[in-house]
């Protein structure tokens, strides 16, 4: 066997693949030619030394309490303002209200994030329904820390529709 073939067999044996060897080379080194494993890429160590990646060091804050509490009254005023401005003159239409729910949710979420409340996860739930002499009862249950987590909600009504909006602020430790 030539030196080139021996070197190729040695490299392939080192990588765990013999599938690319010719049948006479396989017989010469005593392996079967029915090898299944192949290697399509192998990173050689030492070739990427010239590429320098900046190291970013992050330190733990060890903060377990918020520096600023969730502003319930500010968020309630924000909900009142957004719901009134978007729904004051609207009549209930199924498709319009479906799209309006998504739009109002995104607007409320963006405005609450603009308050820059650090380390709080913001969850916004908006429900819009038609007023037709019916009763509705809505509720929510949460597993959270009473000392740090909170919520704010507002109910809006006009002649043809109602909207219930709730914003949950959950502290992220």
Curated annotation (Swiss-Prot):
Transmembrane segments: none annotated. One of its GO terms (cellular component) is cytoplasm. InterPro entries: Tctex-1-like (IPR005334), Tctex-1-like_sf (IPR038586). CDD domains: DLC-like_TCTEX1D1. GO terms for biological process: cilium assembly; microtubule-based movement. GO terms for molecular function: dynein intermediate chain binding. It holds the Pfam family Tctex-1. Belongs to the dynein light chain Tctex-type family. This is Dynein light chain Tctex-type 5. It comes from Danio rerio (Zebrafish). The gene is dynlt5.
């Amino acid at each position: 066997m030539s030196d080139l073939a021996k070197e190729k067999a040695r490299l392939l044996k080192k990588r765990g693949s013999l599938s690319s060897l010719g049948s006479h080379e396989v017989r010469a080194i005593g392996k079967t030619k029915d090898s299944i494993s192949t290697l399509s890429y192998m990173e050689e160590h030492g070739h990427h030394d010239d590429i320098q990646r900046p190291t970013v060091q992050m330190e733990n804050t060890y903060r377990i309490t918020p520096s600023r509490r969730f502003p319930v009254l500010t968020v309630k005023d924000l909900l009142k303002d957004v719901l009134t401005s978007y729904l004051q003159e609207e009549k209930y239409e199924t498709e319009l209200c479906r799209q309006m729910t998504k739009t109002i949710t995104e607007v409320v979420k963006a405005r609450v994030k603009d308050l820059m409340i650090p380390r709080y996860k913001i969850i916004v739930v908006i429900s819009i329904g038609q007023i037709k002499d019916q009763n509705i009862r809505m509720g929510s249950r949460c597993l959270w820390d009473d000392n740090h987590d909170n919520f704010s909600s507002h109910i809006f009504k006009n002649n043809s529709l109602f909207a219930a909006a709730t914003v949950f602020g959950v502290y992220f430790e």
